[in-house]
Design a protein with these regions (language model features):
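Membrane-embedded alpha-helical bundles of multi-pass enzymes
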Residues: 2-210, 417, 444, 459, ...
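Short, aromatic- and cysteine-enriched interfacial helices/patches
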Residues: 1-8, 275, 350-359, 363, ...
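Non-cytosolic juxtamembrane linkers/loops
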Residues: 15, 197-251, 417-425, 430-437, ...
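Short, conserved active-site loops that position catalytic residues or coordinate cofactors/metal ions
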Residues: 31-47, 69, 74-76, 225, ...
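Bimodal feature
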Residues: 250-251, 311-318, 364, 401, ...
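Soluble catalytic regions of membrane-associated enzymes that act on cell-envelope
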Residues: 206-344, 373-378, 383, 387
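CN hydrolase (nitrilase-like) catalytic-core segments centered on the catalytic cysteine
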Residues: 121, 262-264, 272-296, 355, ...
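Active-site catalytic loop in hydrolytic enzyme cores
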Residues: 79-81, 130-162, 280, 315-396, ...
C-alpha cells in the first residue's frame, strides 16, 4: 500500500508531513468525533518515535507532533490569552519530550534489547503520574481523559483509573503500529484486536447487565447556576439578592444547596465574615430557601504574618493570605471551611520560588492540612473546587474510605467564550465520578451545572445562559478500589523498570556464555 509505505518511511520529511497530517486528523477525531479514534491515532507518533537514529531532527519531529497534540485539544487557551496560551502549548509540548528522553537514556545505558516498548509505556505512565503532583500540573492531556465522552466503554477505570486507560490506549496503538510495520500478519492482528476490543466488550456488558444499587441511600442536592462570570463588576450583595430570589421562589425542600465558586469576592475575611450581613443573609436562607445546608464559594482573606498580600487600614499594614474557599453554613454556629489546594498553573498560583517573575495572578495560597470533606447528616462529601477535579490523583488520594459523594463548586469564567473548553471540562469531571465510583454534582458561575452518577452517566446537565436551579437526587456510594491502587502505582511501575534491567543483565550474561561455548566448540572442531 503506497500510503502505508509512505507512513512508515523513516527518512523523508515529506513522509513525516504525511504522518503529521494523519496524526492531527485522527487525534482531533478522537476528541471531537468519538474517543475510539484514540485507539489508532498514535500510530503515526510511534512510527516517528521508534526510529533507530535519535538526532536533532528526530526530537524536532516529536516536538512538532507534541505541539499538534496540545494545539488540537487545548487550542482554546490561545482564545483566552494569545501570549499565555501559546506559551502553555509550547512548554507542555517540551514537557511531553521528557518521558521519551528518560526512555532513551534508560534503554541506552541499561543496554535494554528486549522490552523497549514496555519500558516506554512504563516511563510514559510514570510521567503522567508525576505530572499530577507538582506545582505546574496540567493533566488535561492525560491520554485516558479522551474517553470522557463515552464512559460506558471504560467502566474499568474504577479499578485502574484514567492512567490505566492511558496504558490501554498506548498499548493498542503500539500493536497496530507493529501490524502495519509487518504488513498486517493475521495472527498478530488477532492479538491486537483482542487487546483493543476485550476491555470495551467487558465494559459494555457491565454497563448493560449490572444495574446501580437501588438500595443505596439518596440525597437531594440543589445546584444553582448564577451566570455571573468571575470578572463581572457586581457586588456580593447584588449577587446574593439574585441567588436569594432564585432559591426563595423554589419551594422544593433542599438537603444541600450548592452555590458556585468565588461567588463571594468583596473583601471577605475569615475573622469578620461571621459578623457581617452576608453571613446573616445566608443564615436566614436556611429557613427561606427550605434547605438544611448552604455551601458557597468565596475569595477568603486570612490574616497571616507571612502572607503575600497587604491590607492598609488606619495607617496600619496587615499581611494576609488569600484562599479560594468553600464555606458551609447551616443551623449550627460552626462555619465549615474547605480551602482549594490545586490551582491552574501561573494563572491562579505562582510558587514562591518564582515570585521574582512578578506575574499577574490571583496570588492564592495553599494549606495542605485543611480538610477536603464536609460531614452532613452522618455522610461525608468530598468538596472539589473547580480545577481540583481535573487532577485525578488529587481526588482519589484525598478520598476517605467512607466518602459518599463529590460536590463541585466551579466558576468556568476561565473559559471565556470557549464552549469547547467547557465541554471537555464536563467530560473530564465525568471520569472523576466514574473512576472513584462516586456521584458528582457541580454548580457553576458561568458554565454547565450537572449531576453525574457513579458510573459517569449524565443524570442532569444544562449549559446555563440565565440563572438556573437544578435539583438532583443522587444515590450515595463509597470509593472504588482505584483510590487504593493509585497509592502503589508508582512503586509498581518502578519495580517493573528495575525488573527489566535485571532481566536485561541476565540475558546478556546468558548470551555471552552461549556465545563463548559455541566459539569453543567451533575451535575444537
Amino acid at each position: 500500500m503506497p500510503l502505508l509505505s509512505g507512513l512508515y518511511n523513516e527518512q523523508s520529511w515529506r513522509c513525516f508531513l504525511l504522518r503529521w497530517l494523519i496524526f492531527g486528523v485522527l487525534l482531533s477525531a478522537s476528541w471531537y468525533v468519538h474517543p475510539l479514534f484514540s485507539l489508532c491515532c498514535f500510530v503515526p507518533y510511534f512510527v516517528t518515535l521508534f526510529r533507530h537514529k535519535a538526532n536533532g531532527a528526530w526530537y524536532l519531529q516529536l516536538f512538532i507532533l507534541n505541539l499538534t497534540w496540545n494545539a488540537a485539544v487545548t487550542y482554546w487557551l490561545c482564545q483566552l490569552d494569545v501570549v499565555r496560551g501559546s506559551g502553555a502549548l509550547l512548554v507542555n509540548s517540551v514537557l511531553f519530550l521528557l518521558p521519551v528522553i528518560l526512555w532513551r537514556l534508560y534503554v541506552r545505558y541499561g543496554r535494554i534489547r528486549h522490552g523497549q516498548a514496555l519500558a516506554l509505556l512504563l516511563w510514559w505512565i510514570l510521567f503522567e503520574y508525576a505530572h499530577h503532583l507538582w506545582d505546574f500540573s496540567w493533566t488535561w492531556l492525560t491520554v485516558g481523559n479522551v474517553f470522557g465522552k463515552a464512559p460506558q466503554l471504560v467502566l474499568w477505570y474504577s479499578w485502574v483509573g484514567v492512567m490505566g486507560g492511558s496504558a490501554w490506549i498506548l498499548t493498542g496503538n503500539y500493536l497496530l503500529y507493529q501490524l502495519g510495520k509487518r504488513s498486517w500478519q493475521t495472527q498478530k492482528a488477532y492479538v491486537a484486536l483482542m487487546v483493543i476490543a476485550l476491555p470495551i466488550a467487558l465494559s459494555t456488558g457491565w454497563w448493560l447487565l449490572k444495574q446501580p444499587n437501588a438500595a443505596a441511600p439518596e440525597k437531594d442536592i440543589t445546584a444553582i447556576a448564577t451566570t455571573m462570570g468571575g470578572t463581572d463588576e457586581i457586588s456580593d450583595r447584588e449577587k446574593m439578592l439574585i441567588v436569594d430570589s432564585l432559591a426563595t421562589c423554589d419551594k422544593k425542600p433542599k438537603g444541600i444547596t450548592l452555590l458556585p465558586e468565588v461567588l463571594l469576592s468583596d473583601d471577605v475575611w475569615l475573622n469578620r465574615f461571621p459578623l457581617g450581613d452576608l453571613y446573616a443573609g445566608l443564615k436566614h436562607g436556611i429557613r427561606s430557601w427550605h434547605t438544611d445546608n448552604i455551601i458557597v464559594g468565596a475569595l477568603l482573606n486570612v490574616p497571616d504574618a507571612e502572607g503575600l498580600h497587604v491590607e492598609e487600614r488606619m495607617a496600619l499594614q496587615q499581611h494576609y493570605s488569600r484562599y479560594n474557599a468553600a464555606l458551609m453554613i447551616n443551623a449550627s454556629d460552626t462555619l465549615s471551611l474547605k480551602l482549594k489546594k490545586v490551582y491552574v498553573p501561573l494563572a491562579e498560583y505562582v510558587p514562591s520560588y518564582l515570585s521574582f517573575l512578578h506575574l499577574k495572578t490571583y496570588g492564592f495560597a495553599k494549606d495542605p492540612y485543611n480538610t477536603n470533606h464536609f460531614d452532613i447528616d452522618g455522610k461525608k462529601y468530598f468538596i472539589g473546587i473547580c480545577y481540583e477535579v481535573v487532577n485525578s490523583l488529587f481526588i482519589t488520594q484525598s478520598l476517605k474510605e467512607n466518602t459518599n459523594a463529590i460536590l463541585m463548586l466551579s466558576s468556568e469564567s476561565f473559559f471565556g467564550e470557549s464552549e469547547t473548553g467547557r465541554q471537555q471540562y464536563m467530560n473530564i469531571c465525568r471520569l472523576r465520578a466514574l473512576e472513584n465510583s462516586l456521584p458528582l454534582v457541580k454548580s457553576s458561575n458561568d458554565g454547565i451545572v450537572m449531576a453525574v452518577t457513579a458510573r459517569g452517566e449524565l443524570q442532569e446537565a444544562k449549559r446555563t445562559v440565565r440563572p438556573y436551579v437544578m435539583h438532583a437526587a443522587i444515590r450515595l456510594s463509597v470509593p472504588s478500589c482505584y483510590h487504593v491502587v493509585a497509592k502503589y502505582l508508582p512503586y509498581f511501575l518502578m519495580a517493573l523498570l528495575g525488573l527489566l534491567l535485571v532481566l536485561s543483565v541476565c540475558f546478556r550474561e546468558t548470551f555471552a556464555i552461549a556465545f563463548e561455548a559455541g566459539r569453543l566448540q567451533l575451535h575444537r572442531e
